[in-house]
A protein has these predicted regions:
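Hydrophobic/aromatic residues in alpha-helical transmembrane segments
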Residues: 34, 73-80, 99, 117, ...
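Membrane-interface helix starts
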Residues: 15-22, 53-61, 236-251
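Alpha-helical transmembrane segments of multi-pass membrane proteins
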Residues: 91-100, 278-289, 319-329
Length: 354
């Protein structure tokens, strides 16, 4: 009976986050179908595992790169927070790295990642306005790099490697989503009055529908406007912040992206493909850029499809499925698995305290 109760208690803790686990199943299902598509259509029904990918040297390089990848991801948020005069213990930031990877990869358009970061930062004493600003700045630093460099790489590419993948319909879709991204950033950064009006009208609607009392309406209105103003000030604080913290946040954002792009290089070189590092980085920039517009959880389908099509130019049919699967495994699946465990343990610990 004890064991039965123990199992039931373990399963009961995450029910508040049940939708994330449903999204996880969707993510896994789409990932499986995507890899199968690569195997059938790009790989020509051929697959062979290479023992080089379990060699001691390869695993050593990958483990070092994984550590740096997660470390740089944590440091870029840590220094953004320091630049707006907030200090959160790095161990809490490092835990948040994995939770964010899990949530952002199992929710459409990575929408859950930002919210979970704000939630955990506020739990660590960061005001919601500052937590929202830090999350936005962290994302925007990476977005600037990708949204500027990816179009330039496509435009000035000497080969026709992007022509078969980037059709007119995809270009139209990207332009529309890109415009919406920048419109949202513009409103959030420069038009805080619009946000205040939207929040006010929403609270007023709740009041008219008697979901909240007049007292709560006044309190929520005051708190919301206060946090929006704090959010706006935090963006200014970042631009005027301590140069060493601002520079560090930009530097570690760049290092995070370069570590992300380096997984493919190690995989291909281990399989004896003589491909230049910057050729690999160029393709990875475009693929990561496209993943920002994928509506599926974790960009499943889009990521594998774009990767296999672009890298099939110099990877054999026999290896393309293995290379694509290895890339997703090291850059996404491991982080998602660790994040799921970290989130589960965090919820279970809170459940025990109650």
């Amino acid at each position: 009976m004890k064991y039965k109760e123990r199992i039931l208690s373990l399963l009961a803790v995450p029910t508040r986050f049940a939708k994330f686990y449903l999204f996880l199943l969707l993510f896994l299902g789409l990932s499986f179908l995507s890899i199968y598509f690569v195997y059938k259509k790009i790989g020509g029904n051929s697959f062979a595992f290479d023992k080089q990918l379990i060699s001691f040297d390869f695993l050593t390089y990958i483990l070092i790169l994984l550590f740096l990848y997660f470390l740089f991801d944590g440091l870029r948020l840590y220094f953004v927070l320091r630049s707006i005069n907030e200090k959160v213990p790095f161990k809490d930031i490092f835990k948040l790295v994995f939770i964010n990877i899990f949530i952002s990869n199992v929710t459409p358009l990575a929408t859950g990642g930002g919210f979970v970061q704000i939630f955990y930062l506020t739990k660590n004493g960061v005001p919601m306005g500052k937590a929202s600003a830090a999350t936005l700045i962290r994302t925007f630093l990476a977005v600037i790099f990708l949204f500027v460099s990816a179009p330039l790489i496509v435009i000035f590419s000497k080969s026709e490697q992007f022509a078969s993948f980037l059709t007119d319909n995809i270009y139209t879709y990207i332009i529309i989503i890109l415009a919406l991204y920048f419109l949202a950033f513009y409103v959030v950064v420069f038009k805080k009055r619009y946000i205040c009006c939207i929040v006010y009208l929403f609270l007023r609607l709740l009041r008219k529908m008697h979901f909240i009392s007049h007292r709560r309406f006044c309190r929520y209105k005051f708190k919301s406007i206060k946090q929006i103003i704090l959010f706006s000030k935090s963006l200014a604080w970042f631009l005027k912040g301590d140069i060493k913290f601002v520079a560090s946040s930009i530097f570690f954002t760049f290092m995070f992206l370069m570590s992300l792009f380096s997984f493919s290089a190690i995989i291909l070189w281990e399989l004896s493909y003589a491909v230049g590092y910057f050729d690999i980085v160029g393709l990875q920039v475009v693929i990561t850029f496209l993943m920002y517009f994928a509506p599926t959880p974790g960009a499943s389908g889009v990521a594998e499809g774009a990767y296999s099509v672009l890298f099939s130019k110099f990877v054999s049919q026999n290896d393309i499925t293995l290379v694509t699967l290895s890339w997703r495994f090291f850059t996404i699946y491991i982080g998602v698995f660790i994040g799921m465990i970290v989130l589960y343990r965090d919820l279970f610990r809170k459940g025990k305290k109650r």
